[in-house]
């Protein structure tokens, strides 16, 4: 059952995501912000929760998309000048 919590003023119910999905989200966020230690820990936990290699790589691609779009848009802007 999800437990009501608060983090930096945001109210949420911890446990709303299944454990594997939560660990994949943690992993993807850690990868996106360059937190290698956190990424390794959450990758191990995701695998313990049954994450497949395909699910792990899909999470990596999701982590890359915002940065890739930003790089592309900035490049287009600069090249067009």
Regions found by a protein language model. Give the residues of each.
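Winged helix-turn-helix DNA-binding recognition segment
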Residues: 51
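Glycine/small-residue-rich loop that forms an oxyanion/phosphate-binding "nest" at active or ligand-binding sites
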Residues: 63
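Short, thiol/selenol-centered motifs that function as redox-active sites or metal-ligating centers
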Residues: 25-41, 66
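Ligand-binding pocket scaffold of soluble enzyme catalytic domains
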Residues: 59-60
């Amino acid at each position: 059952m999800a437990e009501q919590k608060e983090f930096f003023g945001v109210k949420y119910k911890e446990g709303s995501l299944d454990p594997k999905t939560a660990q994949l989200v943690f992993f993807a966020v850690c990868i996106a912000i360059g937190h290698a230690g956190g990424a390794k820990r959450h990758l191990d936990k995701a695998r313990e929760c049954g994450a497949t290699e395909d699910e792990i790589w899909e999470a990596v691609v999701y982590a890359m998309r915002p940065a890739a779009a930003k790089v592309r848009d900035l490049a287009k802007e600069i090249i067009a000048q």
